[in-house]
Curated annotation (Swiss-Prot):
Record-given protein name: Chaperone SurA
Cellular localization per UniProt: Periplasm
EC number of this enzyme: 5.2.1.8
Organism of provenance: Xanthomonas oryzae pv. oryzae (strain KACC10331 / KXO85)
Listed GO CC annotations: outer membrane-bounded periplasmic space
Amino acid sequence: MTKPFSVVLASLLAITSTISPLASAQQSQPLDRIAAIVDEDVVLQSELDRAVRNVKSQYAGRENQLPPDDVLQRQVLERLILVKLQVGRADGSGIRVSDEELNRAIASIAQQNGTTVDGLRQKLAADGMGYADFRASVRDEIIVQRLRQSFAQSRISVSEGEVDTALTQQAATGSKYHLAHILIGLPEGATAEQIATGQKKVDGVKALIDKGELDFPAAAVRYSDSPNALEGGDLGWRSLDEIPNAFAQLIRDMKPGQVAGPLRGPSGFQLLKLMEMRDANAGGEKKMVTEYNARHILVRVGDNQTEAQAKAKIDTIRARIVGGADFQATAKESSEDTNSRGQGGDLGWFPADAFGPDFGKQVEGLADGAVSEPFRTQAGWHIVQRVGSRQTDVSAENQRAQVRETIGRRKLEEEYNRYLQELRGEAYVSYRTGDRADNNATAAPAKSADPALPAPPPAKPTR
């Protein structure tokens, strides 16, 4: 089901709406103020105001779950600062988004919302947002996504042994867990005083939840230092292999609705809530796919062979085979695919989409033993002989791939959050709005150590 336009748009822009200072200044009132200086960039007050409005629009009808305006503004400003820092780091790493890529992304957003790009522009104008600002925000979101991808490719790996261990553990428990968390962050190398302050704060938050004065999502929105605080701390469905080992045993023993903690982790103190649990094997029936065994002969098109010459050559080869020549022997003699020529063109068993849609359609349309007409792909001109087909259960293979992906996701989340803390801790930040306004830019502490985070709740801490 397609989300309503306002939901998709708000989700996109709520926090990651980083606006070009020039474009924003042109569309704002006579003068736009600076909310924060971030290294060599700035967060404008208009950006901050727009992002706060977008967050509030997501909580329409649930305003009581949001913190006071000054606290919400601080949280949103910290998110905008993180986005600026990531975009700056990506720029220094050579990560770019072309206008063509940006246009495709915006067209996709419009399509998801059941409208055209022109319709999207009209909707943005009605909501008071300039199209140039919107393009800048989408560009920055894509850049941040690519920075994460680059980080994952360079730093995250999953071994076969880790997959085996996770599968064994999954078979033993057979459960998935819907979790939410609240993080009271601590900087790396926190002092005893910082640890004590964090402990007092997390105890106070836990007391509010236990007494029923705040439900867990509202407490997360108000107090959590986690990047998903404004989503109520929702972590979604996780299997045990996606949960840090320090918490996995604890969660296994919890019942839905229970809140555990405070727990001390690498990033600070955490409260965990088990929202729901379900059988991980539910609906885990076999997944059968058709695989094909085929041989092919390839004639390439290139500097030494024109399109017409290649087509004439493949026609001649096919005529020889139809006339009685052995396909395998002919492939060894004439095919220009060096990977399969030595095996008589044999490609082994493969699903239909393994070599692209055009090749797959040819194989699917043949009877066993039949030879195709010549057809063109990006590689050149082919003929293919289908040898056989079979039904294969790929559920085990898919399960391994899924587990490998979930382990990688967990590692990426842990490592990237640490990376963001380092990035934030090294940043040159000066606040120019709210109660943190100052006149001297300084190297800002990590977000978790920010002195202007919400004060501990008034409830007496409980242990």
